[in-house]
């Protein structure tokens, strides 16, 4: 699509329509999310400005559109090809999870400990083509968890922390513009709303362990609910224990919930017999316990 055609399509998007008529495709869907606001502003200028100003706005629009699409095309080509461990319970429902993420803006994933949701969900998002127009943001409640998850996901994607998988915690940022996944604490993402109120750096956000309900998580969930109508291209995945699934679904206006069982291992209990150093069978209670 040429720059002038994109301007014309943007102009038609502003025309009022009935609630049942289909919405046109976003003319900037293949551009970086961080560039879309600027592109829309330039498109308006190219329509309304007179004479030389209009020509300059059109030239700036065309240049930015070409640059942004080029970056997205390169990011899409460089997306990792994830491999999935079929023994993880979450991968048994990978197709269902991917379908829900593709169809809905918000998805609630309930998974018990050991289900693999923390490491596999960002890979499922990559498989869907997410991460091309912005980072796949992935929050953890604690700094240690963010670093360990980043290391594990990078290992599974055969890349390095600080390259394909970035991590950002307090006083420590190993993220580059070419990173696809960005691990961080929920406090870091909340702080970024001050400088990036529309979270344009991201095309997908995963809020992990949301059932912990810290202040940061609660603020983020409230903020995202207000943001989603303004960012229809943004996908949000919330993971939680089963106890809070319906509450999260109601918060996001009936978002679909999918449950994933945990992975259990057999536990064998053995009792070590009391052993004595001599043949004296009489021992006091304290020695027997110790």
Regions found by a protein language model. Name each.
Residues 11-290:
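P-loop NTPase motor module signature
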């Amino acid at each position: 699509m040429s720059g002038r055609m994109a301007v014309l399509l943007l102009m038609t998007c502003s025309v009022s329509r009935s609630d049942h008529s289909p919405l046109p495709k976003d003319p900037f869907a293949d551009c970086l999310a961080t560039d879309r606001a600027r592109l829309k502003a330039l498109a308006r200028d190219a329509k309304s400005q007179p004479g030389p100003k209009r020509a300059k706005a059109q030239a700036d629009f065309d240049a930015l559109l070409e640059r942004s699409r080029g970056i997205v095309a390169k990011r899409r080509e460089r997306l990792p090809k994830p491999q999935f461990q079929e023994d993880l319970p979450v991968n048994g429902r990978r197709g269902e999870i991917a379908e829900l993420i593709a169809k809905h803006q918000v998805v609630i994933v309930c998974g018990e400990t050991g289900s693999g949701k923390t490491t596999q969900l960002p890979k499922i998002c990559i498989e869907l083509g997410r991460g091309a127009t912005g980072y796949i943001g992935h929050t953890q409640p604690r700094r240690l968890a963010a670093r360990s998850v980043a290391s594990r996901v990078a290992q599974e994607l055969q890349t390095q922390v600080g390259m394909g998988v970035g991590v950002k915690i307090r006083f420590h940022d190993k993220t580059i513009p070419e990173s696809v996944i960005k691990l961080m604490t929920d406090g870091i993402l909340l702080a970024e709303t001050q400088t990036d109120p529309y979270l344009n750096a991201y095309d997908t956000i995963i809020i992990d362990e949301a059932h912990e309900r810290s202040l940061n998580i609660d603020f983020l969930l409230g903020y995202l609910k207000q943001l989603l109508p303004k960012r229809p291209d943004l996908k949000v995945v919330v993971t939680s224990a089963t106890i809070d699934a319906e509450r999260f679904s109601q918060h996001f206006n009936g978002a679909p919930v999918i449950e994933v069982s945990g992975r259990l291992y057999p536990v064998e209990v053995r009792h070590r017999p009391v052993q004595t150093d001599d043949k004296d069978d009489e021992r006091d209670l304290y020695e027997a316990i110790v």
